C-alpha cells in the first residue's frame, strides 16, 4: 500500500504532460504524403522517385533517410543549377511541404533488386528526425508520366 501512493502520483504527473492540445501551432509536425510516383525506369539498376511531404503541424521536421526493400539504397538528392547532389537530409517546414519533383529534389533508388514496371507499387519508409516513420506505397507510372499540377 505504501508503494501505491507514490506510483499513482508519478503516473498522474506523467499524464499531465500528455494533453492533446487543440492549437495546431503548439504541436509536433503532422506529416502526410501525396502525389507519389516512380517513372518506370529505363535502367535496370536505378530509378527516381517523386512525392510531396505535407506538414500540417506547427513544428518543422527533417527527412533523414528513406528505405525500401526494392533497392540496395535510397538516397536523397537535390538539384542546384544544372547539377545534382546527394544530401543527408531535407527540411519539411511547419505548415509547409517538401516537394520531390522532376528537375528538383528527388529520391534515387540505387542497386534495384529488380526493375519496377508500370502498374506495380514500390513500398518505401520515410524516416524523420522527430516524427515516426511513414510507410508509403508509391505507384510506378509510365516513363513519360507527367503529374497533374492542378492548373
Language-model features, listed with the residues they occupy:
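Short, conserved catalytic or interaction motifs in soluble domains
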Residues: 20
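Bacterial N-terminal signal peptides that target proteins for export
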Residues: 1-7
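Compact, glycine-rich, soluble single-domain proteins
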Residues: 25-151
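C-terminal motif of bacterial Sec signal peptides marking the signal peptidase cleavage site
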Residues: 14-17
Amino acid at each position: 500500500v505504501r508503494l501505491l501512493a507514490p506510483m499513482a502520483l508519478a503516473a498522474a504527473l506523467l499524464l499531465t504532460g500528455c494533453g492533446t492540445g487543440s492549437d495546431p501551432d503548439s504541436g509536433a509536425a503532422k506529416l502526410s504524403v501525396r502525389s507519389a510516383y516512380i517513372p518506370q525506369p529505363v535502367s535496370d539498376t536505378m530509378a527516381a522517385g517523386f512525392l510531396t511531404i505535407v506538414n500540417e503541424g506547427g513544428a518543422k521536421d527533417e527527412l533523414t533517410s528513406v528505405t525500401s526493400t526494392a533497392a540496395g539504397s535510397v538516397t536523397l538528392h537535390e538539384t542546384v543549377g544544372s547539377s545534382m547532389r546527394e544530401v543527408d537530409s531535407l527540411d519539411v517546414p511547419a505548415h509547409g511541404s517538401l516537394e520531390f519533383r522532376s528537375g528538383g529534389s528527388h529520391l534515387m533508388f540505387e542497386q534495384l533488386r529488380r526493375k519496377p514496371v508500370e502498374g506495380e507499387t514500390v513500398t518505401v519508409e520515410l524516416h524523420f528526425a522527430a516524427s515516426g516513420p511513414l510507410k508509403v506505397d508509391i505507384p510506378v507510372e509510365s516513363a513519360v508520366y507527367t503529374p497533374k499540377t492542378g492548373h
